[in-house]
Amino acid sequence: MIREQNPEIFLRNAFKDYYRSWSPDPVDLIHQREIGFIPFMGTMIRHRSVTGMKDLKGFGERTVPRHLYYSTAYYRKPEERIMADKEWMGAELIFDLDADHIKVPGNPRYDQILDVVREHTLRLVERFLLSDIGMDPESILVTFSGGRGYHIHVKSESIYNLNSDSRREITNYIRGEGLDSSSFPRMINDGTGITGIWREEIDREFCKVFTDIESSQNSLLKEALGDGRSVRPYVSRLRKTAAGSSAESKLTIFTRPGHEKYQHLDDQDKLVLAHIISQVREKIMCEIDEPVTTDIHRLIRLPGSLHGKTGLAVTPLNIDELKHYEPLRECRAKIWKDSTVNVFMEAEYVIKFGGEIVNIGKGENEVPLDLGIFLLAQRKAKLV
């Protein structure tokens, strides 16, 4: 039968066991960070501080947090309740990628959702932060959030003093904000505003469309122009000599990499460009939670702590690990690995957990303790 015991008590006791054996991951300048937490009974408590890692361990044991956070900012007086009194000294640059902000088609399993978010995270790190912006790999820390996403911490002297507006410029660039068929040609022609991966990808795709114009006619051009009957006369006009060009057609100019072609766009060309920009944004943009990045006083999950909605550990990983990372295998709390618990399921539930597909049937099931904690925390199950 289903227990009358409150599952919250069961979860708190499990978390208590974890924090008793907890060895916190080292955090630089932890004594200059604000600490916050959400207990099992109550709301967020902020403006705490610790003297070092040993004190942090004791803090976890005493409070048994459902969620444990630390500030991405450094302060002279992190325990002060008024933000101005904390005396801000700088902050890491943070990117939060979460399933709440990323479209995942269909009705995916939890682990499949994590795969999609992981791909966005890897793209952000490799294509934008490293390749495009040129950040030092050693300055980047990636952590699995313990829930449905990843956090990226950038630690660099060139970053710490950036204000919110400067950080917003970075998020706007990564998300491709402000790119449209009017602004892009203008920024290309005057050499301002857009460089790097966006310029390269849009220009490459533009050239490709007009190089493969015959195969493009029945798909992209039709969608862009909004009327299949407009495609043939449009292509015919492209084959004519371009205005301002002594001998070349617009089609020839449009197939050549570089900024020249954007000086010859008419209204229909801009419709095609708008469609190309939309497709490129869909392909390479990264959906990040902008308020997290722009907030220079942000609290974020502490590495090594448990996520209260999953029981999974907030886990640091390197960039190579991110390429094939499986949080539901790698982020399980070792203290629970040899125990089981009986749970009652109102409905069947399928998940890849611990590297294996697990089909949990409706009714009573005996499952590994960490999986049971996950199901209880997700409110997918009840204790029996």
Region locations from a protein language model:
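Catalytic micro-motifs at enzyme active sites that drive phosphoryl/nucleotidyl and oxygen chemistry
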Residues: 78-85, 129-144
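A short, conserved structural fragment
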Residues: 379-384
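Long, charge-rich alpha-helical interaction segments
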Residues: 172-289, 293-296
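Histidine-centered divalent-metal-coordination microenvironment in nucleic-acid enzymes
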Residues: 92-95, 135-165, 169
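Long, well-ordered alpha-helical scaffolding segments within enzyme catalytic domains
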Residues: 110-137
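C-terminal accessory/binding modules appended to enzymatic or scaffolding proteins
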Residues: 287, 294-297, 303-314, 321-371
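Basic amphipathic alpha-helical segments that dock to polyanions
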Residues: 374-375
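SsDNA-processing nucleotidyl-transfer enzymes
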Residues: 17-107, 290, 310-312
